[in-house]
UniProtKB/Swiss-Prot annotation:
The active site is at S98 (nucleophile), H123. Its EC number is 3.4.21.92. PANTHER family: ATP-DEPENDENT CLP PROTEASE PROTEOLYTIC SUBUNIT. The lineage of its organism: Bacteria, Pseudomonadati, Pseudomonadota, Gammaproteobacteria, Pasteurellales. GO terms for biological process: protein quality control for misfolded or incompletely synthesized proteins. This is ATP-dependent Clp protease proteolytic subunit. One of its GO terms (molecular function) is ATPase binding. Cleaves peptides in various proteins in a process that requires ATP hydrolysis. Has a chymotrypsin-like activity. Plays a major role in the degradation of misfolded proteins. PROSITE patterns: CLP_PROTEASE_HIS, CLP_PROTEASE_SER. Keywords: Cytoplasm, Hydrolase, Protease, Serine protease.
Amino acid sequence: MSVIPMVVEQTARGERSYDIYSRLLKERVIFLGGEVEDRMANLIVAQLLFLESEDPEKDINIYINSPGGSVTAGMAIYDTMQFVKPDIRTLCVGQACSMGAFLLAGGTAGKRIALPSARVMIHQPLGGFRGQASDIQIHAQEILKIKQTLNERLAFHTGQTIERIERDTDRDNFMSAEEAKAYGLVDEVLASR
């Protein structure tokens, strides 16, 4: 069972309590924690759109601690990050693996950060399918298209060549925060504000 901390604030009208995530959202902080899946993606997309409507000029901060997850859910978040007007500052706390690393790299250039002990991992998309041979072939072609799209966007965000991205994502490729910076997945490694 998960317990979400509450924050109590004094206002002119008395006390007001928020769950910690709602309070941080007031400060334009979104937490992307855990597996990337459809429900999480819908919540994060909604938060991005809400924060854009509140102030389209002020940065949005996404703190990432994720082992990765669904490519389609991740792409919904990624596309919205690119779509909204505010700059998106991404910050890796803990880990940003697979789709988490892709979203970390998808932040606004110059505003992608990792904390010193963060771990980042990139790899090719995973998939599995059972069924008739012709259906398996259709799904295999689709995952290859997705792989190409992800590689092209990673190359764009990191400045690496598509050939290097293809090589480096062939298997799980783990990096320290400093290695992720050298690779172009993040712009800074920060120990303190």
